[in-house]
């Protein structure tokens, strides 16, 4: 279903934020062009741009509070772009709720996923549960990224990692 009308001042601010984030992503990619982890880590930054861009482009802001989520996504994207430009990726060592992304081998698009990393995790192999909970008609990538950065979910086994893939339509 179509989303709600985003007020013009918000739309203008978000559009400007998207331009800044795109420039920051491009600078980071250029600075890290020889980094062997570029292909693995760049989607973790790009997903924030895509989430906001697609929400605006395809009228997928389904509730006005998602405008605030878009501001947060742009801020996190800028933070990650700045870190990655310096060759750092602190989100890869983060505990708790972590938003990541990968580049699809099907179509080359950037796809989000969420992780819940237990505080006790030290890098050794641990149980990992994959929660395939699907998606509703109004769960845009923006809403998913926001949800995965704020909500653990209903299932969190002690000491286990939980992976929340985004249910995409193919």
Task: Give residue spans per PLM region.
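Residue-level detector of short, conserved catalytic/binding motifs and their immediate flanks
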Residues: 50, 111-113, 127-128, 160
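Acidic/histidine-rich, surface-exposed loop or edge segments in extracytoplasmic proteins
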Residues: 2-5, 26-33, 54-58, 162-169
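A domain-start/cap signature at the N-terminus of enzymes
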Residues: 59-126
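Amphipathic, heptad-repeat alpha-helical segments
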Residues: 1-45
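Charged, amphipathic alpha-helical oligomerization/scaffolding segments
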Residues: 13-20, 27, 44-51, 69-76, ...
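Amphipathic, non-membrane alpha-helical rod segments
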Residues: 38-63
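Active-site machinery of serine-nucleophile hydrolases
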Residues: 125-170
